[in-house]
From Swiss-Prot:
This is Large ribosomal subunit protein bL36. It comes from the Bacteria. It comes from Bradyrhizobium sp. (strain ORS 278). The keyword Magnesium does not apply. One of its GO terms (molecular function) is structural constituent of ribosome. Keywords: Ribonucleoprotein, Ribosomal protein.
Length: 41
């Protein structure tokens, strides 16, 4: 999992990217291309 300052640009890189909030943190998850998994931090 990568840690990024801005997830908005990362979200646009693949069609299946989803922005989710869990426990106060923001994540990008992708069930098709798992290499796009990231956390904002």
């Amino acid at each position: 999992m990568k840690v990024r300052n801005s997830l908005k640009s990362l979200r646009g890189r693949h069609r299946a990217n989803r922005l989710v909030r869990r426990k106060g943190r923001v994540y990008v998850i992708n069930k098709v291309q798992r290499r796009f998994k990231a956390r904002q931090g």
